[in-house]
């Protein structure tokens, strides 16, 4: 794992020592090279003899998320260029450094073997994200958003630390690989029930579960483009990854403890999809759509069948790429029109026809059209939830219809209609932006040719 962690850390001196006109090109090309080397991890055996150490390891569950994290850094750097055009040189370098620090922490988090190291990295990702949101966001409300983000996630994950110390006392170890084989079932005592809640709460806030989701739209809307991308694509997946890792250790409590959370996530899925239909703010709409997609993942993980686990991992990867692409598109609109309100940005298809193609592709992947990887994830999760309980098919069906509705609503509001008079002199789209969109779409389409590499350890 060090062959990814060390080069990523060395991107920091590279950024600070680069010549002024080479900051972007140096950091982007080198991070792209690192992300290409990370693709070697896909060629993996089940026994992990190749990349196992006492501190860092990777298995078929963490590998796809790891590669998604590394793939996203060059894309974030490409997306941020015009956002930072008027900033001073030190601030540009600081911004890039923050992104690199965040990426390093995320790599260490996805590959940690010890639960405490996992927890420390889980918390440490808050700091660079908070700095990115509160320093480079667009409106003044970013301070409020940063506060929400910090306190929701901190208060959610403090009980996890207590639960981990309790686990250490009862089992004598906090190693993932040992605890997976620790077969003693937990008895349903009060202390164990509280431990279950403490373990799950941190990840449910991060996912976010409906009801604990209020920080997400705020943070997304106020963050700069790179902040939104990394928040949607990777930071929400920390919750899913943590749940997938820790549910193995909490058997058989999850079977009866999960019911209220399952109901809440299935209901929240419908609610947040419906909220999307009433949004005027483009970024807010995409943020709420992430909440509804992640609710499906929560439900799938809590059911705990092999199919639902596979569907959850596939859906997490697919959603990471899709929502990141939607935020990039929203940002390219914002840079030209300087407003996130959809009514002010309509009729853009006439001015930017090639961008309209990307908008169409992104909307279709968002509503899980074949042959994208989103379809595979949704099929597996919907089928496993249906076989767990038949009446849920009504909730699922409603959700799929509403998802299609808001995706098409977003497409039609931004691309069709009579364009408003202040859009007459907008700048044409750049090659950089088209490359950015292509680098989001190509993995989505290629993964559908060979989806088994992202279906997790149970495939």
Swiss-Prot record:
GO terms for biological process: electron transport coupled proton transport; mitochondrial electron transport, NADH to ubiquinone; mitochondrial respiratory chain complex I assembly. Signal peptide: none annotated. The chain crosses the membrane at residues 22-42, 60-80, 92-112, 113-133, 147-167, 193-213, 224-244, 256-276, 284-303, 308-330, 350-370, 393-413, 435-455. Keywords: Electron transport, Membrane, Mitochondrion, Mitochondrion inner membrane, NAD, Respiratory chain, Translocase, Transmembrane, Transmembrane helix, Transport, Ubiquinone. It catalyses: a ubiquinone + NADH + 5 H(+)(in) = a ubiquinol + NAD(+) + 4 H(+)(out). GO terms for molecular function: NADH dehydrogenase (ubiquinone) activity; ubiquinone binding. It is a multi-pass membrane protein. Core subunit of respiratory chain NADH dehydrogenase (Complex I) which is composed of 45 different subunits. This is NADH-ubiquinone oxidoreductase chain 4. It comes from Caperea marginata. The lineage of its organism: Eukaryota, Metazoa, Chordata, Craniata, Vertebrata. The gene is MT-ND4.
């Amino acid at each position: 794992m060090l062959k990814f962690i060390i080069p990523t850390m060395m991107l920091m001196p590279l950024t600070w020592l680069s010549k002024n006109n080479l900051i972007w090109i140096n950091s982007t090309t080198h991070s792209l090279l690192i992300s290409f080397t990370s693709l070697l991890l896909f060629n993996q055996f089940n026994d992990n003899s190749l990349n196992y150490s006492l501190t860092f390891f990777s298995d078929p569950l963490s590998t796809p998320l790891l590669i998604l994290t590394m793939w996203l850094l060059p894309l974030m750097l490409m997306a941020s260029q015009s956002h930072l055009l008027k900033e001073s040189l030190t601030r540009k370098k600081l911004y890039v450094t923050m992104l690199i620090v965040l990426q390093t922490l995320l790599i260490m988090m996805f590959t940690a073997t010890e639960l405490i190291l996992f927890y420390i990295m889980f918390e440490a990702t808050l700091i660079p994200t908070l700095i990115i949101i509160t320093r480079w966001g667009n409106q003044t409300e970013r301070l409020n958003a940063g506060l929400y983000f910090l306190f929701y996630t901190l208060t959610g994950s403090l009980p996890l630390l207590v639960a981990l110390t309790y686990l250490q006392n009862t089992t004598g170890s906090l190693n993932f690989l040992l605890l997976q084989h620790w077969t003693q079932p937990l008895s349903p005592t009060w202390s164990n029930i509280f431990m279950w809640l403490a373990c799950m709460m941190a990840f449910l806030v991060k996912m976010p579960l409906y009801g604990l989701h209020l920080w997400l739209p705020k943070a997304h809307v106020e963050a700069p483009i790179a902040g939104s991308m990394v928040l949607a694509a990777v930071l929400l997946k920390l919750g899913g990854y943590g749940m997938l890792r820790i549910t193995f250790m909490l058997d058989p409590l999850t079977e009866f403890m999960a019911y209220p959370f399952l109901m809440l996530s299935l209901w929240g899925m419908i609610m947040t999809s419906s909220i999307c239909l009433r949004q005027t703010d483009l970024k807010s709409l995409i943020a709420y759509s992430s909440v509804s997609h992640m609710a499906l993942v929560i439900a799938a993980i809590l059911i705990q069948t092999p199919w639902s686990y596979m569907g959850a991992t596939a859906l997490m990867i697919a959603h990471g790429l899709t929502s990141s692409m939607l935020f990039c598109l929203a940002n390219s609109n914002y840079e030209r029109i300087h407003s996130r309100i959809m009514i002010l940005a309509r009729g853009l298809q006439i001015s930017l026809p090639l961008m309209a193609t990307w908008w169409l592709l992104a909307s279709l992947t968002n509503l899980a059209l074949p042959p994208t990887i989103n379809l595979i994830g949704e099929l597996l999760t919907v089928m496993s939830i249906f076989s767990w309980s038949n009446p849920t098919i009504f909730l699922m069906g409603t959700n799929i219809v509403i998802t299609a509705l808001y995706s098409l609503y977003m497409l039609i509001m931004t691309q069709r209609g009579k364009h408003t008079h202040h859009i007459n002199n907008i700048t044409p789209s750049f090659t950089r932006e088209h490359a950015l969109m292509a680098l989001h779409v190509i993995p989505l389409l290629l993964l559908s040719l060979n989806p088994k590499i992202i279906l997790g350890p149970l495939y």
